[in-house]
């Protein structure tokens, strides 16, 4: 079992030379044998830089699907709703179980595409947004994203949480780049952008409230 702590981004080289970069608070289990290289993503997000081995496919299992690769670079993000696969280099096959005992459905991705799947369904592949691939550097970038989604991502990196009490404020759009593990700096960036004041609760979380 390989894991990263809250706020930690950790890179591990596997026995076959492949590299796995774990995002904050992520867990994988690695099981290699003579026929395949299996990695189970139990929690969080990981980037896989796969060493080529024609005899043993590299398989990442997560949630409702699995990703099969030979020599490539891709991200897998395990979410409550399912998984998101982002392909940076090479090619991968994304498989998901089919109902009624049918053969598993599969989709091939090309570099620059991503695919979201949930139990029994999948969206069509779409182009990735370059900022979404920067997380291994410790920076998070967003383009025209709902503020509530930005904070949900940022809050994974720190025990200090940033909270918005007004749902309407959470739907406002954010574009910017920030260091993932510095919540105070992020709150100080967002506050003036949206006319919000920063308060602290008893747990030292940061509350963004409507300004007076």
Regions found by a protein language model. Name each.
Residues 4-9, 52-56, 87-89, 110-111, ...:
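A short, compositionally biased
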Residues 14, 33, 98, 118, ...:
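Acidic surface patches and DE-rich sequence motifs
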Residues 25, 114, 159:
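ATP/adenylate-binding site constellation spanning eukaryotic-like Ser/Thr protein kinases
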